[in-house]
């Protein structure tokens, strides 16, 4: 800080500012649920329908999305994954933590925790920092297109960073918008 009390700069491990559920727009919530976990409000941390879909995809070679719920992804974000663990053991740990999270927290708290812990690349950890970094706005004021862009980044933040890979990010954003249409969160204009 300067002698007049103004901030000269910041030093941080992660550039993160947490927000509350009330600070999130319906657009960001809908984009996230439509893309990452369409049955989020219907399961208790593990979506067995999604697991069956993934298993069928593995057997047939026709993969159609992942099987991890938002709660399982939150568990991974909070506790990480040991690179030495095999995938099945890592997933089992995530399932256990996800079930515990679902017992302790409401769905609104879980989705807020998730959005506060995700990495949006370009030194933006969490939705508050990402909304500011990429769109100079707050999570409450994110449009459908902005929300879709940010949620699209979650698949691979570095690869879908709109500041670096605009074309790829725009394509991924369109995938998210199509998911929002598919699950009736938005209609065609």
Where are these regions (language model features)?
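Terminal hydrophobic membrane-targeting helix
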Residues: 1-27
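Short, histidine-centered active-site or binding-site loop motifs used for metal coordination
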Residues: 12-15, 36, 78, 154-155
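Non-catalytic, structured segments within soluble enzyme domains
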Residues: 61-189
């Amino acid at each position: 800080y300067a002698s007049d009390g103004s901030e000269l700069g910041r030093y941080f491990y992660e550039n993160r500012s947490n927000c509350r559920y009330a600070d999130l727009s319906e657009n960001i919530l809908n984009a996230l649920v439509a893309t990452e976990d369409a049955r989020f409000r219907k399961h208790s941390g593990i979506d067995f329908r999604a697991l069956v879909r993934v298993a069928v995809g593995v057997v047939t070679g026709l993969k159609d999305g992942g099987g991890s719920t938002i709660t399982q992804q939150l568990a991974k974000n909070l506790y990480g994954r040991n690179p030495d663990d095999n995938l099945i053991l890592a997933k089992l740990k995530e399932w256990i933590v996800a079930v515990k999270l679902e017992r302790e927290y409401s769905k609104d708290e879980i989705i807020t925790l998730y959005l506060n812990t995700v990495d949006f690349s370009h030194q933006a950890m969490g939705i508050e920092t990402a909304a500011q970094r990429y769109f100079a706005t707050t999570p409450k004021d994110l449009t459908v297109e902005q929300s879709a862009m940010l949620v699209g980044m979650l698949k691979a933040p570095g690869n879908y960073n709109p500041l670096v890979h605009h074309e790829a990010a725009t394509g991924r954003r369109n995938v998210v918008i199509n998911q929002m249409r598919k699950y009736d969160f938005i209609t065609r204009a």
